[in-house]
Amino acid sequence: MSALETQALGMIPMVIEQSGRGERSYDIYSRLLKERIVFLIGEVNDQTANLVVAQLLFLESENPDKDISFYINSPGGSVTAGMAIYDTMQFIKPDVSTMCLGFAASMGAFLLAAGAKGKRFSLPNSKIMIHQVLGGARGQATDIEIHARDILRTKDQMNRILAERTGQPLEKVKADTERDYFLTADEAKEYGLVDQVVTQRP
């Protein structure tokens, strides 16, 4: 269930803060956004990507010099939606620190590796999975051929970025992403997808 679906069911906790001017209530995600914490929970799609991008841009406008924490628990999803998040992470001035909690797969793992170097983390029992781009073109043969060429170009683009972000040779990344490649948190650190496995706050 996505965070949006959970919100639709009215299951997102509310936080009430006291101030000299009275009480103010926030949903938990809005309150955490005040602390520069952004979540990607569930599938990466146009809706979740638009929310994440908007939050990153808002936090940059609030303070371009202060890091943003990006927590990821996602099975992946749309490549184009994920690349919108990736490009925004690289575009904005603040460093984006990434943290895997639970599971970061496919585009989720790609975005985990996209954090600022030295600021990519995983909790110890998280799982990370990388694989090649998935496609599902239908229609006339010529259209399928056009889509196949585009998918191969996208696959090559993502492998090159992943090789750059992890420090792994491109040929190794190509081989490893041919099929689902699961890693523990420690293996993800060794691979270069994260910089540190953390068990508690320093």
From Swiss-Prot:
The active site is at 106 (nucleophile), 131. The gene is clpP. Its EC number is 3.4.21.92. The keyword Hydrolase applies. Belongs to the peptidase S14 family. Pfam families: CLP_protease (PF00574). The keyword Disulfide bond does not apply. Fourteen ClpP subunits assemble into 2 heptameric rings which stack back to back to give a disk-like structure with a central cavity, resembling the structure of eukaryotic proteasomes. One of its GO terms (molecular function) is ATP-dependent peptidase activity. It is an enzyme of class 3 (hydrolase). Keywords: Cytoplasm, Hydrolase, Protease, Serine protease. GO terms for cellular component: cytoplasm; endopeptidase Clp complex. It is found in: Cytoplasm. This is ATP-dependent Clp protease proteolytic subunit. It comes from Paracidovorax citrulli (strain AAC00-1). It catalyses: Hydrolysis of proteins to small peptides in the presence of ATP and magnesium. alpha-casein is the usual test substrate. In the absence of ATP, only oligopeptides shorter than five residues are hydrolyzed (such as succinyl-Leu-Tyr-|-NHMec, and Leu-Tyr-Leu-|-Tyr-Trp, in which cleavage of the -Tyr-|-Leu- and -Tyr-|-Trp bonds also occurs). One of its GO terms (biological process) is protein quality control for misfolded or incompletely synthesized proteins. Cleaves peptides in various proteins in a process that requires ATP hydrolysis. Has a chymotrypsin-like activity. Plays a major role in the degradation of misfolded proteins.
